[in-house]
Amino acid sequence: MAVDTETTTTTIPVTDSDRIDDQNNLTSNAIPHASEKTVPDSPASEQNEVSDESEDKPSKTKKSFGFYAIIVALALTSLLTSLEATITSTALPTITSELGGASLYVWVVNGYYLTQTAFQPFVGQMADIYGRRWPMICSAAMFTIGSGVAGGSKNIQTLIAGRLLQGIGSGGILVLTEIIICDLLPLRERGKYLGMIVSLVGIGAALGPLFGGLIVQYSSWPWVFYLNVPIGGVACLMLFFFLRVRSDKTPNYMQRLRRFDWIGNVLFVMSMVSILIALSWAGTEYPWSSFRVVVPLVLGFVGSAAFVVYEGSSFCVNPTMPLHIFSNRTSGTAFAVTFLHTLSSVSVMYFLPVYFQAVLNASPSRSGVQLLPTILFMIPGAIAGGTLLSKFGRYRPLQHGGLAFMIIGFGLLTLLDADSNTGEWVGYQLLGALGTGLALPVLLPAVQAPLTEEDTALCTATWSFMRTYGFIWGATIATAVFNNRFDVLAPRITDTTIGSQLTNGRAYELATKVFMNSIKDPVTQREVKSVYVDALNVVWYVSLAFAGLGFLLVFLEKEITLRKELDTKYAMEEKKKKPENSEA
């Protein structure tokens, strides 16, 4: 609800539903409540500033057994989705050797990310219309069913279909986990639990390649996917029995369907699919200049522009991604910082294994172990960030601190070379990992602080999308600059045969211990490692630059008081509530 700062009347909201933004610039459709009080000739409200002494006291919400059961179920599903995102990286060669379809293998990985990304805003709107309970249960069930389909596949096409189902389910899980945590806890307390979930996601992503390698080595590849079925089944049952939350129900089924932004969702999904197809082909299947890359990329960006125009038009009654969540300075900046934070951190995590395998001659499994310092220090960083946010209620210092650590850590990576010892490559990872974890759980609260609780589902879905989108572009940009720099430096390799093998986008693919050991001449091997080191330095510098840009953008955010009271119509059902007030 906007407040006219030119008048002498001050509006004091009684509930957090009427949250006004910083600088009173939020022009949303919030409806005034009857409980609002108007105090004439009072001093300007200071509700957006962290000035009250009581604001430093951490909030405490009474938590039932059902609350913790829900958190456990959300943690299990989040762990599985992150594990499944990386587990195929080491298992894929074995899978394709048995199923065939080598020309389609890339979609076993990319299909998962494609549907995971494209359907996130749609799931956010579904949560607004149907409540949180059934969309979450259905997302977890779809992920579990997709895992069963993938595990039981007899050909590559069925495997890809299973991965597409897994992706849709995982996208829903990512969005709804964060939405449900926001429904269960006031804004001041959310960071702590978001930090816990982020930690589990980091553990899953780290263990994925290791689990994939162990499964194909000591068991059979279907268990790469089957392992999700029993655990996912347990999580579904826990959600069914304990995720009892209130729902804003519309009795008429057709009225609910009409509330969906069908045109906007179709435009968004088609645009994202087009962009992601182009990015999956660029630099690997086809050069960036190929029409097979350029055409879908252009169509995707044009479709994205059309989506934005439509969402802001009068024709869109119930937008999937309302533009007012971006027009606010603090939330809009926090979205951008989230994208840059993810892009820079993913670029580093994506290419550290290249350094370990191509430069230090590590095996894939050994490389996974060498990456553990990043994951292990990201986890306490995330927990610390969430805990400090709950205690002090200030997100800007934590964002600045996290991004500063990332800048220093990524800068130190430029010192790595073929002669670096264990202490160096472990130590240099620690600062970047700590900073990545510290900033992550305090980004979503910064988005939500100036917005109303009615915006929770849609702004959370948008934030989750920005994070996933940053992941995709982080890998894409890092790969592009790495390949380009490697091609420029390749003439330094005196053996032209080896040099030609590594150019035109193949340096990343051949960054393995097996390939490096196939180079028998020690001088040539040293030259190749030197080119890898210098090409990787460009990746570290680019990651540093994006983190630096994020650091500067944080100055645009305002430090807004984080709400200590829970004001949502989707809170947990109380035992004495009538059945019609809860989701069936």
From Swiss-Prot:
It is found in: Membrane. One of its GO terms (molecular function) is transmembrane transporter activity. PROSITE patterns: MFS, SUGAR_TRANSPORT_1. Residues 1-11 have a biased composition (Low complexity). The chain crosses the membrane at residues 65-85, 99-119, 134-154, 167-187, 196-216, 223-243, 262-282, 293-313, 334-354, 369-389, 398-418, 425-445, 462-482, 536-556. Keywords: Glycoprotein, Membrane, Transmembrane, Transmembrane helix, Transport, Virulence. It comes from the Eukaryota. Glycans are attached at N25, N328. Its main location: membrane. Residues 1-60 are annotated as: Disordered. GO terms for cellular component: plasma membrane. It is a multi-pass membrane protein. PANTHER family: MAJOR FACILITATOR SUPERFAMILY, MAJOR FACILITATOR SUPERFAMILY (MFS) PROFILE DOMAIN-CONTAINING PROTEIN. Belongs to the major facilitator superfamily. MFS-type transporter; part of the gene cluster that mediates the biosynthesis of GKK1032, fungal natural products containing a macrocyclic para-cyclophane connected to a decahydrofluorene ring system that show potent antitumor activities. This is MFS-type transporter gkaD. It comes from Penicillium citrinum.
